[in-house]
């Protein structure tokens, strides 16, 4: 085997989480090698699949600190309005009740990927190897030794799995998962609308699943329509005009006339959680560690919190002259993330089952709950601060501080 690369950390997966992990380590001078079997597109900002990401306030601070924030493409979320089907009761979150900052921002994934790739490729501490997957990886007390599918290989002090919900690294390490399907599929698209959205995000709970209208820059909005699996193929076969008509049936005319402004995509919705997020010289971040329903729009934010926590531990150990891939540091990472991951997954799962249930007594109870919470400003402020990520102390990067 020809050793082509030696670095302190090897990262499997060159998606958003993998590149964010590499750039975060680079900010403290730690060299990494990022590996992905897929090639990175040359100009990904021109490639749109309609997918967007909600970025919380603290996640934005982290991305700004790392130079990863594409501000020109980000739309602030100032208000959130939650309704349950045709009920007149609603829950309204106004960002001014929690401070002067937006509750979050919405941005198309293509712009995040473009910025992440640009910054990573410009770094001298980051080597990106694409087009060849990892065919073999060994972990022992001396470090990590890996072989790529082209026969080349390398060494590192530790390996980080950022290779998604079907993580090869997680499976090869023998880390089991638990989870289930929600029997729903998310249909994603971007619309152009006639009337201004005023940076208000809408989420309407329908029997088939939540229906979200999320503000993008200008006269555009992102649709995330979760629906029963059986109905999705029928909807996806409709032409654009008919599909837009189905969108209006499930929302209202507050945005005026609408039209599709790009391709549609879909993906099945499920919950998956790894039984462990660390092992011998190994750590998992992002979807490789946990995958959730998009009902709360927190999946990527949870992954960024993984990255911020893990990077802080790695950097602190390196400065102390300790082994960055040692068991003590990885145990600390495991402990630091346990409560946050478990709490958010449980809350998201509970909301999904509760609001996808059309049994009349359940529907009446949740409608009354929405109306009641809407009249409790302190509770609403607590919910907003939790969603913004400002409740409690977190890793330095989430507070806008450099490593």
What name fits each language-model region?
Residues 3-5, 64-65, 75-172, 180-185:
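Conserved N-terminal helical subregion
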């Amino acid at each position: 085997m020809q050793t082509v690369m030696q670095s302190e950390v090897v990262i499997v997966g060159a998606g958003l989480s993998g590149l964010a992990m590499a750039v975060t380590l680079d900010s403290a001078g730690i060299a990494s090698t990022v590996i992905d079997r897929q090639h990175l597109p040359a100009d990904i900002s021109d490639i749109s699949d309609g997918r967007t990401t909600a970025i919380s306030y603290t996640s934005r601070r982290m991305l700004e600190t790392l130079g990863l924030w594409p501000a020109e493409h980000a739309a602030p979320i100032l208000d959130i309005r939650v309704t349950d089907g045709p009920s007149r009761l609603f829950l309204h979150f106004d960002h001014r009740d929690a401070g002067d900052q937006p509750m979050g921002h919405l941005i198309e994934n293509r712009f995040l990927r473009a910025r992440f790739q640009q910054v990573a490729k410009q770094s001298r501490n980051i080597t990106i190897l694409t087009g060849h997957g990892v065919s073999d990886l060994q972990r022992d007390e001396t470090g990590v030794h890996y072989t790529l599918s082209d026969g080349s290989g390398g060494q590192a002090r530790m390996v980080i799995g950022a290779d998604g919900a079907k993580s090869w690294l997680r499976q090869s390490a023998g880390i089991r998962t638990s989870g289930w399907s929600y029997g729903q599929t998310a249909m994603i698209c971007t619309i152009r609308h006639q009337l201004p959205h005023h940076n208000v995000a809408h989420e309407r709970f329908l029997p088939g699943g939540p229906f979200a209208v999320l503000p993008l820059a200008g006269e555009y909005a992102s649709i995330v329509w979760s629906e029963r699996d059986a109905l999705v193929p029928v909807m996806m076969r409709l032409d654009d005009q008919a599909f837009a008509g189905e969108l209006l049936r499930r929302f209202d005319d507050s945005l005026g006339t609408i039209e599709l402004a790009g391709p549609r995509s879909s993906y099945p919705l499920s919950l998956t959680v790894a039984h462990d997020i660390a092992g011998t010289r190994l750590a998992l971040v992002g979807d490789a560690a946990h995958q959730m329903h998009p009902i709360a729009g927190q999946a990527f934010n949870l992954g960024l919190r993984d990255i911020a926590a893990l990077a802080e531990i790695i950097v602190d150990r390196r400065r102390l002259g300790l082994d960055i891939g040692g068991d003590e540091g990885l145990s600390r990472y495991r402990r630091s993330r346990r409560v946050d991951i478990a709490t958010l997954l449980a809350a998201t799962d509970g909301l999904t089952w509760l609001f996808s249930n059309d049994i009349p007594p359940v529907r009446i109870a949740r409608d009354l709950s929405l109306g009641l919470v809407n009249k409790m400003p302190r509770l609403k402020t607590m919910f907003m601060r939790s969603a913004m990520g400002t409740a409690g102390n977190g890793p330095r990067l989430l507070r806008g501080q450099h490593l």
